[in-house]
Amino acid sequence: MKLLLTLLLGSALMCITLADECGLGTHRPVKEVIDNVRTMYYCDCRAGDAERSITVSRCDDNNQKQDDVILTYCGLEQTTGCNTNPYTAAKHDSSGDKPQFYCSCLNYKYEQSHSDYRHWTIRCYMGNICD
């Protein structure tokens, strides 16, 4: 398993998909067709709802800090947009590419994977925050 990020609150192993979670809370689904073939979904803040940021550390497989990434989310609370803790609605926009929506695991490491451009799965599991 590849460990990607750590955050600030959390709970047990769970799985969700973008199609299930996008559009909850203050997020709305956005569908984009790439090269007339591939379809990519991500979430964006609804009009009038402020986007907020949080900086988190990305860890390697040995729980050592690699770097920091900035996550953006909608609304006042980080849990907005995801209906089950420990997830928080976020989109990773630091690459400069189109934002990718996921619900991240607070205070626990998580693994993000996707089977195709329409179905995203995110799995949370318990772990320590890297220093």
Swiss-Prot record:
PTM section of the record = Contains 4 disulfide bonds.
**What's the domain of life for this entry?**
Eukaryota
Excised during maturation, the propeptide residues are 20-38
Predominant location category:
secreted
Transmembrane annotation, as ranges: none
Q: Which UniProt keywords apply?
A: Disulfide bond, Ion channel impairing toxin, Neurotoxin, Secreted, Signal, Toxin
Query: Secretion signal: which residues?
Result: 1-19
Subcellular location per the Swiss-Prot or TrEMBL entry: Secreted
Give GO cellular component annotations, separated by semicolons: extracellular region
Recorded GO molecular functions are: ion channel regulator activity; toxin activity
Expression tissues = Expressed by the venom duct.
Fill in the domain comment.
The cysteine framework is C-C-C-C-C-C-C-C-C.
- Any idea what job this protein has? Probable neurotoxin with unknown target. Possibly targets ion channels.
Q: What is this protein called?
A: Conotoxin Cal8.1
Q: What is the lineage of its organism?
A: Eukaryota, Metazoa, Spiralia, Lophotrochozoa, Mollusca
